[in-house]
């Protein structure tokens, strides 16, 4: 199948980054014998804009996507996280290529209002929506036109290459990495845990409580030293929702602790998550 994948590829970023959700999706498509072309909406907008001011290139990016669809004739278009590609553009694609399937894949939480609005807008025009939240909480989008599916955060074997479950010499007993503070009070829980364990274990909280965040290879090096980690979302309670922290930890054999309200005990093996 010929796939056109619309997402942000960070073509203008040259510093320490790690594999993205979108990149893992693309690797998976290729591994399953599909041909994939990428359209990095934010980069195209910046390339097309006067003086490289991305916001001035939004209309041009939509035109370029239409041009790419016409030039490549994809069987499937996967729309990832985008605030640039419009519903009107997707409707034009529908008119011009009625046999092409459109799906939206979304890995962001529903408690962020702009993301919920984005899902609803795309659900009105695409064939299916895949979200890293369970169907129980996706019912709010029922009746908008698209079929709704849960999709777990992907683990990529060329990225998650460790198996810490087989190691006994790891210096970091417990880990929590995050510098996000919007829509959350989770640092209160992290502080309580940090105070409770005291000097009994080596608990690293990169990005919080004065410890600098780690990115790219530095983050990978931290994971390579870690026994256990906290998988805490900015808000808890959405069915089966988690950030891609779950795949980064589980894929590398790190035992993780998650909030019970997410319901992961319904399908995640007990030996991988508490």
Model-derived segments and their meaning:
Residues 1-51, 64, 71-72, 81-88, ...:
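Nucleotide-sugar donor-binding catalytic core of glycosyltransferases
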Residues 54-68:
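A short, well-structured beta->alpha microelement
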Residues 55, 79-80:
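Short gly/ser-rich anion-binding loops that grip negatively charged ligand groups
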Residues 57-58, 97, 251:
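Short alpha-helix boundary/capping motifs
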Residues 75:
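Short acidic/polar active-site loop segments enriched in Thr and Asp
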Residues 80-81, 94-102:
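Short, conserved structural micro-motifs that define repeat-unit consensus positions
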Residues 90-97, 194:
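Surface-exposed amphipathic alpha-helices with a cationic face
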Residues 100-115:
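A short, histidine- and acid-enriched strand-loop-helix "catalytic/donor-clamping" loop
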């Amino acid at each position: 199948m010929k796939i056109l994948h619309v997402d942000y590829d960070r073509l203008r970023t040259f510093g320490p980054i790690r594999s993205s959700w979108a990149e893992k999706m693309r690797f998976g498509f290729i591994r399953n014998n599909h041909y994939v072309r990428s359209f990095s909406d934010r980069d195209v907008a910046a390339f097309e804009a006067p003086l490289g001011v991305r916001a001035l290139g939004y209309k041009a990016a939509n035109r370029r996507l239409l041009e790419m669809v016409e030039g490549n004739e994809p069987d499937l278009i996967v729309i990832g996280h985008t605030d640039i590609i419009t519903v009107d553009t997707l409707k034009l694609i529908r008119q011009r290529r009625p046999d092409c399937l459109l799906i939206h894949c979304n890995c962001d939480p529903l408690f962020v209002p702009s993301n919920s609005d984005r899902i609803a807008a795309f659900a009105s025009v695409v064939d299916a929506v895949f979200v890293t939240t369970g169907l129980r909480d996706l019912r709010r989008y029922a009746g908008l036109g698209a079929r709704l599916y849960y999709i777990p955060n992907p683990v990529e074997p060329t990225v998650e290459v460790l198996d810490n479950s087989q190691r006994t010499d790891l210096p970091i007993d417990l880990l929590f990495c995050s510098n996000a503070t919007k829509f959350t009070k989770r640092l209160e829980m992290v502080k309580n845990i940090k105070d409770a364990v005291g000097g009994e274990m080596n608990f690293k909280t990169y990005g919080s409580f004065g410890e600098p965040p780690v990115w790219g290879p530095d983050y990978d090096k931290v994971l390579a030293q870690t026994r256990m980690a906290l998988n805490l979302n900015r808000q808890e309670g959405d069915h089966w929702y988690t950030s891609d922290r779950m795949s980064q930890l589980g894929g590398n054999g790190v035992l993780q602790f998650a909030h019970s309200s997410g319901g992961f005990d319904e399908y995640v093996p007990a030996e991988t998550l508490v």
